[in-house]
Curated annotation (Swiss-Prot):
Positions occupied by motif Gly-cisPro motif, important for rejection of L-amino acids: 137-138
Keyword Transcription regulation applies: no
Gene3D superfamilies linked to this entry: D-tyrosyl-tRNA(Tyr) deacylase
Enzyme class: hydrolase
Gene: dtd
Protein name in the entry: D-aminoacyl-tRNA deacylase
GO terms under cellular component: cytoplasm
Protein family (similarity comment): Belongs to the DTD family.
Gene Ontology biological-process entries: D-amino acid catabolic process
Main location: cytoplasm
Pfam families linked to this entry: Tyr_Deacylase
Amino acid sequence: MRAVVQRVSSSSVCVDGDIIGEIGVGFNVLIGISKDDTFEDLKYIKDKIINLRVFHDENDKMNLSLLDIKGEILVISQFTLYGDCRKGRRPNFMEAQGGEEAKKLYEEFLDLLKTSNLKVECGEFGADMKVKINNDGPVTILLDSKRNF
């Protein structure tokens, strides 16, 4: 599983012109699911996200986590995180999990995040979405449950 975690002052996602998810201070998270991801991968990424210490403390050091600040999370599914561009000019998405299995894991991931008692919003799996991200910093962290980064 891969995640692009962006610290935001706010973020929202629209489908067909309607806002379906919106947050204030927290993380905008783009999630990609691979063919070999398991529940353990979901837990690993969830724990990393909620415990990343990238929010400023009283000394202006990045020392606080999403849990510490009671931040919010907007999760967007994005299979293109598994685009392999090493050969040719068109990305190969063979490593991305497809269809129903990816949707099932995505929903399990959302359920896991919700156990953290933080506000969790999400996009619509498989939909064409418009995402507004007001980056704070910017701070962007790449996570990979297979530790490839």
